[in-house]
């Protein structure tokens, strides 16, 4: 029997499985209070997915407000759309705008790695499409268990194939990212996908439904049983110790070729002025799209749910509403434009159906074969869910963790020991070449990729006539964030900011994806709140806004949470991509190598401590955001004036790793001469922040050095590029051939996963 609104009103005591749907007792009572009756089965399903942690941000919302509190009017000046929209949009000049966002698809990617990762890419691409933009590139932040753990092969293989298969089929270049291995991610990988889109400012579209009588059109793929309770339930629950799910919702199934057609269809609809408001269908499906569109508009909405094209027989209204079938969009269209809208969809062979209209009321009403199964105030579904002030407590173990310094570890001293250390780090899964993974992605499709391979940040040309471009980088360090969540988030921000700066671009905006354990753990909530405040304060110090983001909680197996992993993405703008700064050495004969910034004895949380002693303790490197701003300004000026021919930021593995990566990228040797009195181990392997390796043309050395001195930026000459050499030599200590470095680095991942 169909559970209608009328039936629900006359059967107040009918038992309902709200607990099985993830609702708490008090949440169920609140729904009854809102409606003045018990919810129908369909309403109950709708509230359960929309009030899930993934969709409602009920544990994080109270803390995320701090981003708004710390964003000044000056920081907002370039933002065309920010937090609360499908994706942030930034004015980059000359009438152009860029939209970008990063989101998680962690839990589905463990259950079914290929489809979980593929649909993660598809979902973030549709968020970008919904802003009126053409998607132009993707990036990914991946975290897996230990490289030698049995299940890591299954998960990594599926995730990498899923990302490559979907992104390559869409014709979107994958311009960068990061892959990290750590035992804490066994059973709970992180798959964070970022997409960048480009649009003219006048083409910006937002998610709202207004104008009584305007039609609601669902277009794209048919609606099936895949993904019901998928990301919205999976992302709001943990895995048990055996790695199996406590709940068994299905993972969504993606069709990249349908999405590719959908992109072109949307762009033609936008160009024709046929769209008033638009929303993609992601987590919670039509439940989310209809309630968000209605609550953001100036009226109500009616939906004839039985009009939705299905690909499975005998689906219930709740299943149709909550299905997370992919490649679907929902648009608000003026009645006079419906025929033209449908004609464009027919041209692209995209199925489109009028399923409802905007009303002048204040309710979201959904019917099924003429009977009302949903009658709710839409804001209570989409925006007025529960908000929790979870208990926050600094873990009792934090003091002991911070007291466990790496200074107690044995350090290499001799040239042979330093050489062995370099090869050990380079030959570990933590610092080895990622070519085995990245070669499965198309980095140069569409022909606008300027930097991707070997680069700190990816760069794209946006305007062929002027050369205007953008650079993007994403970074995170769970190890540093465990030691100090506030500083760890700022270090991730600083590195992403620096990675954009070393390309010659100017950082302008931030997005984030905050991956943490259970919010019901006060220690996790302490990590989360500290990371949010660190990131927000850091953005305020740098003067760049957070335009949006995502929170992923319940990333744990049993009671063991992942390392707190705030992923930070930074967008930069460059006036002309022809003045970009590459990573590889050897562009100019006899380049001088210089180290910018201060090097301190900072090894707590470092890759050296991890690889050589499996040690994690102490305090992370010092963060100096004023220095990061200064570095960015110097690099931008140097790029404009042609003073720098290559640059590479220093992070994991320190100076030694940066030198090796730049030498291999340029396929040229170099000779390093350490400053007199320097500790070779500290200078080569410290992970102090705020540092950059630059190659300066011989003719520009004095000019560049003078600019650094004038601005108060430490700059030390540490060697020269030797195009006649096939080795990296640290004078007086050791030398390693490029062939040995490359072989050591490139052999690691194929050994584990080939």
Curated annotation (Swiss-Prot):
Its EC number is 6.3.5.3. Pathway: Purine metabolism; IMP biosynthesis via de novo pathway; 5-amino-1-(5-phospho-D-ribosyl)imidazole from N(2)-formyl-N(1)-(5-phospho-D-ribosyl)glycinamide: step 1/2. Mg(2+) 1 binds at residues 103, 550. GO terms for biological process: 'de novo' IMP biosynthetic process. The active site is at residues 54, 105. Monomer. Part of the FGAM synthase complex composed of 1 PurL, 1 PurQ and 2 PurS subunits. Belongs to the FGAMS family. This is Phosphoribosylformylglycinamidine synthase subunit PurL.
């Amino acid at each position: 029997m169909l559970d209608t609104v009328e039936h629900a009103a006359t059967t107040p005591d009918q038992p309902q499985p709200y607990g099985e749907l993830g609702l708490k007792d008090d949440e169920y009572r609140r729904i009854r209070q809102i409606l003045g009756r018990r919810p129908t089965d369909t309403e109950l399903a709708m509230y359960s997915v929309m009030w899930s942690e993934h969709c409602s941000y009920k544990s994080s919302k109270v803390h995320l407000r701090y981003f708004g509190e710390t964003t000044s009017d000056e920081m907002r000046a370039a933002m065309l759309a920010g937090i609360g929209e499908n994706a942030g949009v930034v004015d980059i000049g000359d009438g152009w705008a860029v939209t970008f966002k990063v989101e998680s698809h962690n839990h589905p990617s463990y259950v079914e790695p290929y489809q979980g990762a593929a649909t993660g890419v598809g979902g973030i691409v549709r968020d970008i499409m919904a802003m009126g933009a053409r998607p132009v590139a993707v990036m990914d932040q991946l975290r897996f268990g230990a490289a030698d753990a049995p299940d890591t092969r299954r998960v990594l293989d599926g995730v990498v194939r899923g990302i490559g298969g979907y992104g390559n089929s869409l014709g979107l270049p994958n311009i960068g990212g990061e892959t990290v291995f750590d035992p804490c991610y066994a059973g709970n990988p992180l798959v964070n996908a970022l997409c960048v889109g480009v649009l003219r400012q006048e083409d910006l579209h937002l998610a709202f439904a207004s104008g009584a009588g305007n039609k609601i059109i669902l277009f794209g793929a048919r609606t099936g049983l895949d993904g019901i309770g998928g990301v919205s339930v999976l992302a709001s629950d943990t895995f048990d110790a055996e790695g199996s799910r406590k709940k068994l919702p299905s993972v969504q199934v993606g069709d990249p070729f349908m999405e590719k057609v959908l992109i072109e269809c949307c762009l033609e609809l936008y160009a024709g002025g046929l769209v008033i408001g638009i929303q993609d269908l992601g987590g919670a499906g039509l439940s989310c799209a209809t309630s968000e569109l209605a609550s953001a508009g100036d009226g109500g909405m009616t939906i004839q749910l039985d009009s939705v094209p299905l690909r499975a027989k005998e689906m219930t209204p709740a299943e149709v509403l909550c299905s997370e079938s992919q490649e679907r969009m929902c648009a608000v269209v003026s009645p006079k434009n419906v025929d033209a809208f449908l004609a464009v969809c027919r041209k692209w062979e995209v199925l489109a159906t009028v399923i409802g209209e905007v009303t002048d009321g204040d309710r979201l009403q959904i019917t099924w074969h003429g009977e009302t199964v949903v009658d709710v105030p839409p804001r209570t579904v989409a925006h007025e869910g529960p908000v929790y002030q979870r208990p926050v407590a600094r873990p009792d173990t934090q003091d002991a963790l911070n007291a466990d310094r790496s200074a107690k570890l044995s350090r290499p001293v001799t040239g042979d020991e330093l050489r062995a250390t370099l090869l050990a780090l380079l030959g570990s899964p933590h610092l080895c070449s990622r070519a085995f993974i990245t070669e499965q992605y198309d980095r140069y499709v569409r022909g606008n990729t300027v930097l991707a391979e070997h680069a700190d940040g990816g760069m794209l040309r946006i305007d062929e006539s002027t050369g205007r471009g953008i650079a993007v980088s994403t970074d995170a360090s769970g190890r540093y964030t465990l030691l100090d969540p506030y500083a760890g988030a700022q270090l991730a921000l600083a590195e992403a900011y620096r990675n954009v700066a070393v390309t010659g671009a100017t950082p302008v905006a931030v997005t984030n994806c905050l991956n943490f354990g259970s919010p019901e753990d006060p220690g996790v909530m302490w990590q989360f709140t500290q990371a949010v405040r660190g990131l927000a304060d850091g953005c305020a110090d740098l003067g760049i806004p957070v335009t949006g983001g995502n929170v992923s909680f319940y990333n744990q197996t049993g009671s063991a949470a992942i390392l707190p992993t705030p992923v930070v993405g930074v967008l930069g703008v460059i006036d002309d991509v022809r003045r970009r700064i590459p990573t590889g050495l050897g562009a100019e004969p006899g380049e001088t190598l210089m180290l910018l910034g201060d090097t301190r004895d900072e090894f707590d949380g470092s890759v050296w401590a991890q690889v050589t002693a499996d040690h994690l303790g102490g305090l992370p490197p010092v963060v100096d955001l004023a220095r990061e701003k200064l570095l960015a300004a110097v690099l931008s000026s140097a790029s404009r004036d042609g003073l720098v021919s290559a640059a590479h930021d220093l992070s994991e593995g320190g100076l030694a790793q940066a030198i090796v990566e730049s030498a291999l990228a340029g396929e040229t040797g170099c000779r390093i001469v350490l400053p007199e009195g320097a500790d070779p181990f500290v200078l080569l392997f410290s992970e102090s922040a705020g540092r950059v390796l630059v190659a300066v043309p011989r003719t520009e050395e004095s000019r560049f050095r003078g600019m650094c001195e004038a601005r108060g930026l430490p700059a030390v000459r540490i060697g020269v590029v030797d195009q006649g050499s096939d080795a990296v030599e640290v004078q007086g200590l050791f030398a390693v051939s490029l062939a040995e470095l490359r072989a050591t680095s490139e052999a690691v991942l194929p050994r584990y996963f080939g």
